Amino acid sequence: MLKTKKTLLSALAISAATLASASDIKELNFGIIATEKAGAMRQMWEPFLQDMTKATGIKINGFYATDYAGVIEAQRFNKVQLAWYGNKSAIDAVDRSQGEVFAQFVDLDGTPGYYSYLITHKDSAVKTLDQVLQNGKQYSFGIGDPSSTSGTLVPTYYVFTLNKLDPKTHFRVMRSSNHEGNFLAVLNKQVDIATSNSEMTEKMKEKSPEKMDQIRILWTSPLIPRDPLVWRKDLPSDVKKKVQDFVVGYGKNDREKEILKNMYRLAGFKASTDAQLIPIRQLELFKDRMKFESDVNMSAAEKQTKIADIDAKLAALAKAK
């Protein structure tokens, strides 16, 4: 017992020492989700990260994974301490990777959110969403990363779940890619239909309008909350303050405004919390509820239990708003 107490006291002492010296952190890794090729993401984000290094006195290293899960897992194992996510991937980071939302994108035009799209080539025979819903086996489909809000969760719920369809079986073939990959696949007629979002289309309108001219938007989602920035909860409070002060104060001069404009046409960032994820959590739960309701292979008792569990979670989220 005495040995156990000594071991515990020793561990607590080490922990206290670690916390006491935590403000001496010299480097942090900032995870960037893979909405486009790593080279393009570096070009957009590195000027911002370099300015963060100068302002905070902490070296900020960009971490560019090939998929969303790579950033989530890196944050889980403390290989990444700060990250940009979509709302759906931020939920995974908060629930599994010690994450906590601390800031949110603000659009250049003041829009409080963005939109998910279904797109096709302008030469395509697909003219309406009804054609997509009624004749899926005639078409190939490009969906987003599994952890993408606008590339997967939102279109899956609003286009397919509400119409009692599963995109995995509805189409002749389905492939998964990031937003850039899906846009280019439609542009090059490699898939008939794909998910996209207003961030990607606005970028294309500005940088390659001739490419955007080849694209037809078939469906537009309800407004999606703008993306969050997430840090690990266990970062020291003084480091958190340095980071948040820099982030929410960024964009005051012309140089910073230009950097933000190149980052998906941003005006800056505002302080935020995990509460911004509630609408997306509700969306995921509604999607699961409808899936269970329509599952003919599930027993009535199991179905009732699962639906009751979802309803309890939805009620708790409604109170948390």
Task: Enumerate the predicted regions with their spans.
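Bacterial N-terminal signal peptides that target proteins for export
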Residues: 1-9
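Hydrophobic h-region of N-terminal signal peptides that target proteins for export
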Residues: 13-21
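Bilobed "Venus flytrap"/periplasmic-binding protein-like clamshell domains
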Residues: 25-53, 65, 88, 111-184, ...
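Periplasmic-binding protein-like
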Residues: 29, 33-34, 107-117, 209-244, ...
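An extracytoplasmic/periplasmic, membrane-proximal ligand-sensing/linker region
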Residues: 36-37, 43-47, 239-321
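Extracytoplasmic/secreted proteins, especially bacterial periplasmic and envelope-associated proteins
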Residues: 40-47, 51, 70, 74, ...
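Short helices/loops that flank or line small-molecule/ion binding pockets
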Residues: 69-83, 96, 114, 179-194
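A ligand-binding cleft/hinge motif common to bilobed small-molecule-binding domains
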Residues: 84-97, 160-161, 187-188, 192-212, ...
